[in-house]
Curated annotation (Swiss-Prot):
Cited function: Chemoattractant for eosinophils and basophils. Acts as a ligand for C-C chemokine receptor CCR3 which triggers Ca(2+) mobilization in eosinophils. Also acts as a ligand for CX3C chemokine receptor CX3CR1, inducing cell chemotaxis.
Record protein name field: C-C motif chemokine 26
Similarity-based family: Belongs to the intercrine beta (chemokine CC) family.
Superkingdom to which the source organism belongs: Eukaryota
Keywords: Chemotaxis, Cytokine, Disulfide bond, Inflammatory response, Secreted, Signal
PANTHER family assigned to the protein according to its UniProt record, in alphabetical order: C-C MOTIF CHEMOKINE 26, SMALL INDUCIBLE CYTOKINE A
Gene that encodes it: CCL26
Signal peptide start and end residues: 1-23
Subunit structure: Monomer.
Segments crossing the lipid bilayer: none
Tissue specificity comment: Ubiquitously expressed at low levels in various tissues including heart and ovary.
GO cellular component term of the entry, any: extracellular space
Gene3D superfamilies: 2.40.50.40
Cysteines joined through disulfide linkages: C33-C57, C34-C73
Length: 94
């Protein structure tokens, strides 16, 4: 009986680690969805890049990546978000 419990525990642990591994590998930005937005505007000097969430997500969002690599979900209709997107699209002058 104890062998059956141990076997069940090992099987459960294996399945869980497989699931977590898949979630980690699949965490590129195109598969990231946002479930809440940041309430405060980011300082412009922190922003490095942006991307939109996938169409398969339940709500649209703009994900800004900071210079430190942090990803921040923002509402795409906020004026400051639209301004930052516009600034990031503009080619930089040398």
């Amino acid at each position: 009986m104890m062998g059956l419990s141990l076997a069940s525990a090992v099987l459960l642990a294996s399945l869980l680690s497989l699931h977590l591994g898949t979630a980690t590998r699949g965490s590129d930005i195109s598969k990231t969805c946002c479930f809440q937005y940041s309430h405060k505007p980011l300082p412009w000097t922190w922003v490095r890049s942006y991307e939109f969430t996938s169409n398969s997500c339940s709500q649209r969002a703009v994900i800004f990546t900071t210079k430190r690599g942090k990803k921040v979900c923002t509402h795409p209709r906020k004026k400051w978000v639209q301004k930052y997107i516009s600034l990031l699209k503009t080619p930089k002058q040398l």
